[in-house]
Each structure stands twice: as C-alpha cells, then as structure tokens.
C-alpha cells in the first residue's frame, strides 16, 4: 500500500493522480509527433476539458526541454531521434507535468555511459528542487552512487531498505543478485 497525504494512491482518480505523480515507464510507444508535442502531454492533467495550453504551461514545457537539453529537438519527429534523445524527451515530458513525485523505471535505458551519468545528475538536480524521485535501476553501481535510500527486492519481497551505504554494506545486494561486493 502506498499512501499520499494519508490516502491510498489507488483511490485517486486518474487526473488527480497525474497531478501528483509523473511516471516514466521503461518502454513506451513512439507516437508520430514532434518532441515538443510529446513534452506538452505532460501538461494535460492540469488542463480543463477543451482548454488550450496557457503561457504558464508553455513556460513549463520550455523549462523541461531546456533542463533536459532537448530544446534543439523540439521540431523533430520522435521517430527521427536516437534512443538517448528520445529518452531525454520523455524525461522532459515527465518534468513538464510538474508533480511532487516522479516514478522513473530505468531512466538510463537507451543512454550511452556519458549520457547515463548526465541523466542521473539531472535527476539529482530535480530531487534537489524538493521533488521525490523513485527510480528502478538494475545497474547496481549507479543505483548505490545516485540514491539516498535503496530498496532491494528478492522474489517480490523486501530484502533490504535504508540509506544506500548501509544497504550496500549489509551484503544483501551481493547475496540477492549473486555478485561480489567490495
């Protein structure tokens, strides 16, 4: 059970939930739209039926594209983008939604090693803005380097939870994932 303000998240309506939580799934469709149009989709939970984007919405979209380094891609079709560029555009959409909580499932998917570090630094900056970031990362060194708190699951059950350094030192991740830790 996950609570927000004492209320089970499953009890929120879709639009209400989307105003609180933005989600970046690991795999997504690639619609035939321009990058900026996709980023604008993050603003839809904040719009009334039939209402157009406001200047404030456009500013959030521009900000999200700027911080993710995707402004130069705004007029390109998603299908024309590399996997890494597309991943950053999807993160921009998630940021333009302007929620307090971000769920990111493997946000470094499709990124080369340099882009992975850039993405995680950016996510750290988002967290420093006061946003709660929950990430799924299977790259253990990255997970332990870029997370304040870590949860380790084993066969769907909680195996360890706590500050990253303490969970790492516990040896649980090494046992669960069958790797040696140093």
Where are these regions (language model features)?
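H-loop/switch region of ABC-family ATPase nucleotide-binding domains
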Residues: 137-138
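Catalytic Walker B motif of ABC-type/P-loop ATPase nucleotide-binding domains
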Residues: 102-106
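Conserved ABC ATPase "signature" region
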Residues: 40, 55-73, 98
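Conserved ABC transporter NBD signature motif
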Residues: 1-7, 17
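A short, surface-exposed alpha-helical micro-motif characterized by mixed small hydrophobic
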Residues: 143-145
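Conserved ABC ATPase signature
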Residues: 52, 77-81, 85
């Amino acid at each position: 059970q996950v609570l927000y303000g004492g209320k089970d998240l499953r009890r929120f309506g879709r639009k209400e939930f989307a105003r609180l939580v933005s989600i970046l799934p690991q795999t997504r469709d690639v619609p035939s739209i321009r990058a900026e149009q996709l980023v604008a989709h993050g603003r839809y939970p904040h719009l009334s039926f039939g209402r157009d984007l406001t200047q404030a919405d456009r500013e959030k979209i521009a900000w999200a594209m700027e911080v993710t380094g995707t402004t130069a891609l705004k007029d390109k079709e998603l299908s024309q983008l590399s996997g890494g560029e597309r991943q950053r555009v999807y993160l921009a959409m998630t940021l333009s939604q302007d929620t307090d909580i971000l769920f990111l499932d493997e946000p470094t998917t499709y990124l080369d090693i340099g882009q992975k570090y850039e993405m995680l630094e950016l996510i750290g900056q988002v967290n420093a803005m006061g946003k709660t970031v929950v990430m799924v990362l299977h790259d253990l060194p990255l997970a332990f380097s870029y997370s304040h708190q870590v949860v380790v699951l084993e066969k769907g059950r909680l195996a360890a939870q706590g500050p990253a350094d303490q969970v790492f030192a516990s040896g649980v991740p090494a046992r669960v994932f069958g790797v040696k830790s140093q």
